[in-house]
């Protein structure tokens, strides 16, 4: 199963608040790509494949390489879900451990999802456009280009994208 979509995401937790337009694609099992577009190109490109996650900040020439776990995604994005659990949320399946989940359905896929994550963070994702079983290039889930970029940790990565 694959998915490609454009979302408006609002995330609120005791330590973080943010809103963003997100371009997101996934292919099961275990492949996720997320981009935060900016005025001159992507501000952030996140690719998770199997057990590895890359977060590339083209404008900052910075890269984070870490595990593709719920803990690492929480440290980076504030979302304590695995890549496959993010996929579940977007196709209308409540992952185990969510405190609350509500999907407002379009004809085939949810058009809006509201969830309270295991850590209490509240996530609202409004789907602007989405396609299920999208024809995605395998290269979409390759390690993003980052030759010559400096290595950063999750706290610096979070600071870079959330400012």
Briefly describe each language-model feature range:
Residues 6, 17-25:
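Beta-strand-dominated lipid-handling architectures at cellular/organellar boundaries
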Residues 97-163:
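Non-transmembrane domains of secretory- and envelope-associated proteins
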Residues 27-83:
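An acidic-aromatic
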Residues 16-20, 44-48, 97, 121-124:
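Amphipathic hydrophobic-ligand
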Residues 1-15:
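A short, Trp-centered hydrophobic/proline-enriched beta-strand micro-motif
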Residues 22-26, 48, 100-104:
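Extended lipid/amphipathic-ligand handling interfaces
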Residues 7-11, 33-37, 112-117:
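Short beta-strand segments that buttress and anchor functional surface loops
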